[in-house]
Amino acid sequence: MIQSCIFDLYGTLVDIHTDEGNPEVWKKLALFFSYYGADYEPEELKEAYSLQVRKLTETFRKEQEKKAEKENDGQPDKKNRNPGEGTESPEYESSPEIQMEEVFLQLYRERGVEADRTLAVHTGQFFRSLSTEYLRLYDGVEIMLSSLRKVGKKIYLLSNAQSIFTAHEIKALHLDRWFDRMFLSSDYGCKKPDPRFFETLLNTCEIDRNTAVMIGNDGTCDIQGAKRAGLSAVYLHTNLSPVETVAEADAVIEGADMIQLEKLLLGEL
């Protein structure tokens, strides 16, 4: 029987549309930077932002690889093997997640401005609000979560997301009251499908993987990641799902059908 329900966020419980390519976003963000003495042209800021994301991600990846080798006496990381498997899939071994406030700190520094972390966080939140066209729950989400709670199931969030804005979006949608514990990737330095992210949740919350299920809309991050962690997985094929074939899911639900999902998780299907 399912006792622990582990949910993805965006595309699973939350419908969101962001457009970071909108020129108006960068025009307004450049104006915001200028308030603090960091002058950028909009397109220049956009390019500098993309470059910093790539640079910081690659630097963090290399740091993680060096740390893993050191912990294993110079040998490749062998901690994240699949339960019962003797081989590894390298593409899953390193899925680093940087903290976006570091990107904005660097962008200020490039213009000679020593911004503090608070300003960097607020800049990131402003950027997110500029680029978000809508943010809403899928129909029936709270009814479904309430039904799970009423029968005593544990509810967890495991999301590839940036804490500086996702934590606030969760509060704005009044979702935080439903979760026993929330895990956002930027707080842990790795993201799905990295086995370390799944293991962090399972170990921290002392979850029996035999009675737990992952629910998500991404075949690689959610479904394959869950399977590698020894979890059952339910795939929601929603408007935000990548174009993909999902063969490993234990169950597939077309659309964000919370009625069907509720029945499935309660053992009524």
Give residue ranges: language-model regions:
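Surface-exposed cleft-lining segments at the edges of enzyme active sites
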Residues: 90, 126-135
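A metal-dependent, Asp-based hydrolase signature
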Residues: 30, 40-125
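A generic alpha-helix surface/boundary motif
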Residues: 27, 98-102, 164, 196
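A short, well-structured juxtamembrane/interface segment
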Residues: 137-141
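Walker B catalytic carboxylates
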Residues: 8
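Basic, amphipathic juxtamembrane/active-site segments
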Residues: 20-33
